[in-house]
């Protein structure tokens, strides 16, 4: 007999909703546990089976911790600004707000149907003005402290789409959507000074319980390098340029220099003879993205400017080239080229026939650049020194002679914070006709997005908000001065930078959150989500959190103490699930056919949480069969409790396996090893089927252990066991170490490596006694009759191997 999942799941979901079973109360004395999911972007496609994998993992933790006596904060909300909704609005003429609301309703219904124990009274939505009021407030604080500023920066401008695109949205010089040409052009944009926090973002990673791979990605993204800045004069011009290098020790090997095509000197120093060639080159590379330009596999291109730089030590003239592999946005936009000891410079020098001068011994520069350490040669006062010594000595020389200094640089750039889009948070700044700008006063927040049907991009590089005259134009009531509101909106990252703080106090209209509540709940204890957010979201959220710490809003330096990335669920054919491949599995269908508990159990049992694993309908059926077996063990044909379940039986049946199960399941849940915990639950059920009676205490303990994974069947069986309250706050089972020990063990006896007998013996038997019992066994006697026993190998608790011939 199997159970009716539709009836049971509906019954308990209604019960939890009606009784607000999972409402979190702030003022209690229990220890806190804050477990967080990366909140989803509510797309038109709805939830897919990948979402519940992470959500089930956090739900198991939340449910177990409640039963262990913790006060648990486990919330859900919506990261609802973003390009797809705007694109939909452009394609259909419908309001993105309506589209978003409809999608959120679908997501909420789907998530509730999976039985997650969220406190829905704390639900947030980044597009709600009561929420983005505080996103805007944080922006104003950043502006006040000089961390939000405007600057001319080269951006990816797509004339056809009439907007600026992020680097991720440009592929091979064309827009990801529609394949339109993209060019680089300078435009005034808002930036946030994340670079001011580079060192702290780097150093504080050490204190976090995060996957090493994610920490490493953040370290690389921040990209701290130590070296020197060196000044070069331009021959015949009153101009200088600066290069940054991590290898100032190789300065004597510099044979030419390279400027980025966008470098302001290019125009000033190019000779008349080279002008046409330089202009043609600049035109040819205009549409390339930074990623493409720095691709190591691509062939190097460049052009000579006709001008020369003066070597700061030797006074030699070094030709100045321009090449697209040097980026204006990285370092100083200029490099000194040392082809003998740098692979890219070597390739470039070979292609354009430029001199290659060896200054570090140890390689064969006729074949390739030598990038290792070695003794310095052809280097005047550095000769004979190794790399470390030579770097130190060269920096001392540069500083003493006013030609350069020690310098630390970062790969990290300031964060480009404006989007020429409608569907985002308005930036609360007013630009006045006299060229000044002022922030919108705090008491006027939120500055709301106006409702409009004019969502088409303007084509001027401004957002569609520029079309809405009555919103854009303002007059200062005191002075009569005219102004225009900032028309750029914030990127989707803004709302997700701080959402975990708002869950703590979601209805506060006086402040971002009550400081006492923040002190109680921060930091987040466990944060689970996809690895695709390893760098940007997590880095931006850490930056905002550190800023809020500096201005006294939050009490901790870091937002997320432990981070875990779940793997991906692939299609049955091991490919990524996608609409175009037609291999997407919809959770609604599975809940209908197999039930939410089965889906939750299957996704946790598929394999390790961090692994990417293919979906299997067979595996799903297996999960359902296990739950049917559990049901039949507890409930008889008539729907009553199995009469084998009794209070205080006179036997220690199931005692050892029960205590082992409590220990293993508890430890595995804590460590997010859900697949092995479920295996142990299966072991217990197999043993229980063999038992003559079922002690009620153990059966109740089993239901408690199962309930975080399969909460609906957990509640139903708890009720069948005679309880009329929810299982959600029942105390978590405990185990007794002394009951884990096996009294008897099975020993394998081998003759010449082949198994010939098995013995049940006391677990604490001595080695001598064990060997004696093995030799006296009838089957063993047969196999060694007439042979000489050469040696006996005994592994206590495991085996005896008799070598005889």
UniProtKB/Swiss-Prot annotation:
Query: Is Transcription regulation tagged as a keyword?
Result: no
CDD domains cross-referenced by the UniProt entry: Anticodon_Ia_Leu_BEm, LeuRS_core
Q: Which Gene3D superfamilies match?
A: 3.10.20.590, HUPs (3.40.50.620), Isoleucyl-tRNA Synthetase, Domain 1 (1.10.730.10)
Lineage, top-rank taxon, reads Bacteria
Alphabetically ordered keywords of this record: Aminoacyl-tRNA synthetase, ATP-binding, Cytoplasm, Ligase, Nucleotide-binding, Protein biosynthesis
Query: Which PROSITE patterns does the record associate with it?
Result: AA_TRNA_LIGASE_I
Mention one GO molecular function: leucine-tRNA ligase activity
Chief subcellular site?
cytoplasm
Q: Where is this motif: 'HIGH' region?
A: 40-51
What's any one GO cellular component for it? cytosol
Q: Which reaction does it catalyse?
A: tRNA(Leu) + L-leucine + ATP = L-leucyl-tRNA(Leu) + AMP + diphosphate
Query: Motif 'KMSKS' region located where?
Result: 576-580
Q: Which InterPro entries match?
A: aa-tRNA-synth_I_CS, aa-tRNA-synth_Ia, Leu-tRNA-ligase, Leu_tRNA-synth_edit, M/V/L/I-tRNA-synth_anticd-bd, Methionyl/Leucyl_tRNA_Synth, Rossmann-like_a/b/a_fold, tRNAsynth_Ia_anticodon-bd
Where in the cell does this protein reside? Cytoplasm
Against NCBIfam families, the record matches this protein to: leuS_bact (TIGR00396)
Q: What is this protein called?
A: Leucine--tRNA ligase
- Species in which this protein is naturally found: Geobacillus sp. (strain WCH70)
């Amino acid at each position: 007999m199997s159970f009716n999942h539709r009836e049971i799941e509906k019954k308990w979901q209604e019960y939890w909703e009606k009784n607000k079973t999972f409402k979190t109360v702030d003022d209690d004395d229990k220890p806190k546990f804050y477990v967080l999911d990366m909140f989803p972007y509510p797309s038109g496609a709805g939830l897919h089976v990948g979402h519940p994998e992470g959500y089930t993992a956090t739900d198991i933790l939340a449910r177990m911790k409640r039963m262990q006596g913790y006060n648990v904060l486990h919330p859900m909300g919506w990261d609802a600004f973003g390009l797809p909704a705007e694109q939909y609005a452009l394609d259909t003429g419908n309001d993105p707000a309506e589209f978003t609301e409809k999608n959120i309703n679908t997501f909420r219904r789907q998530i509730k149907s999976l039985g997650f124990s969220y406190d829905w009274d704390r639900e947030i939505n980044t597009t709600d003005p009561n929420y983005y009021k505080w996103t805007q407030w944080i922006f104003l604080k950043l502006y006040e402290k000089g961390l939000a500023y405007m600057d001319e920066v080269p951006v990816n401008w797509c004339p056809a789409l009439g907007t600026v695109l992020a680097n991720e949205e440009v592929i091979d010089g064309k827009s990801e959507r529609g394949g339109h040409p993209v060019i680089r052009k300078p435009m005034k944009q808002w930036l946030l000074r994340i670079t001011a926090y580079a060192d702290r973002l780097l150093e504080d990673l050490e204190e976090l319980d995060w996957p090493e791979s994610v920490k490493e990605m953040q370290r690389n993204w921040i990209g701290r390098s130590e070296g020197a800045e060196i000044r070069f004069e331009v021959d015949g011009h009153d101009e200088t340029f600066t290069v940054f290098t991590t290898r100032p020790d190789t300065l004597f090997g510099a044979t030419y220099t390279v400027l980025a095509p966008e470098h302001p000197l290019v125009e000033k120093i190019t000779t008349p003879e080279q002008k046409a060639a330089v202009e043609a080159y600049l035109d040819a590379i205009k549409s390339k993205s930074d990623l493409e330009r720095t691709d190591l596999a691509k062939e190097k291109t460049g052009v000579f400017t006709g001008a020369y730089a003066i070597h700061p030590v030797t006074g030699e003239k070094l030709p100045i080239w321009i090449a697209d592999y040097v980026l204006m946005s990285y370092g100083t936009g200029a490099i000194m080229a040392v082809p003998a000891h740098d692979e890219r410079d070597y390739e470039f020098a070979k292609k354009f026939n430029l001199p290659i001068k060896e200054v570090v011994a140890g390689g064969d520069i006729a074949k390739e650049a030598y990038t290792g350490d070695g003794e310095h040669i052809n280097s005047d006062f550095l000769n004979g020194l190794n790399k470390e010594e030579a770097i130190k000595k060269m920096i001392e020389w540069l500083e003493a002679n006013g030609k350069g200094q020690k310098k630390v640089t970062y790969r990290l750039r300031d964060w480009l914070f404006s989007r020429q889009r409608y569907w985002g948070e308005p930036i609360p700044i007013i630009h006045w006709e006299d060229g000044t700008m002022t922030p919108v006063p705090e008491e006027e927040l939120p500055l709301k997005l106006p409702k409009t049907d004019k969502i088409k991009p303007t084509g001027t590089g401004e957002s569609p908000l520029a079309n809405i005259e009555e919103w854009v134009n303002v007059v200062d009531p005191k002075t009569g001065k005219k102004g225009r509101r900032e028309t750029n909106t914030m990127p989707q990252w803004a709302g997700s930078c701080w959402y975990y703080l708002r869950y703590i106090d979601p209805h506060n209209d006086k402040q971002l959150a009550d400081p006492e509540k923040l002190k109680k709940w921060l930091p987040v204890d466990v944060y689970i989500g996809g690895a695709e957010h390893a760098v940007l979201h997590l880095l931006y959220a850490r930056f905002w959190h550190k800023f809020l710490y500096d201005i006294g809003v939050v009490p901790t330096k870091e937002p997320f103490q432990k981070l875990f990335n779940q793997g991906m669920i692939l299609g049955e054919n091991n490919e990524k699930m996608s609409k175009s491949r037609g291999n997407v599995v919809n959770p609604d269908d599975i809940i209908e056919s197999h039930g939410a508990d089965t889906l939750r159990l299957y996704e946790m049992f598929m394999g390790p949480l961090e692994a990417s694993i293919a979906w299997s309908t067979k595996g799903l059926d297996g999960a359902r069969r296990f739950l049917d077996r559990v049901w039949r063990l507890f409930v008889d044909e008539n729907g009553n409790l199995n009469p084998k379940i009794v209070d205080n039986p006179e036997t220690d049946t199931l005692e050892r396996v029960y205590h082992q199960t409590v220990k293993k399941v508890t430890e595995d849940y804590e460590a997010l090893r859900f697949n092995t915990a479920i295996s142990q639950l299966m072991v217990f059920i197999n043993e229980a089927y063999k038992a003559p009676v079922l002690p009620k205490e153990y059966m109740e303990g089993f239901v408690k252990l199962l309930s975080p994974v399969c909460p609906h069947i957990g509640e139903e069986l708890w009720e069948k066991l005679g309880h009329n309250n929810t299982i959600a706050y029942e105390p978590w089972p405990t185990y007794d170490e002394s009951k884990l020990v096996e009294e008897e063990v099975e020993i394998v006896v081998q003759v010449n490596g082949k198994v010939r007998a098995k013995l049940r013996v006391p677990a604490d038997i001595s080695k001598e006694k064990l060997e004696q019992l093995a030799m006296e066994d009838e089957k063993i006697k047969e196999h060694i009759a007439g042979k000489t026993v050469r040696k006996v190998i005994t592994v206590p608790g495991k085996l005896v191997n008799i070598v005889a011939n």
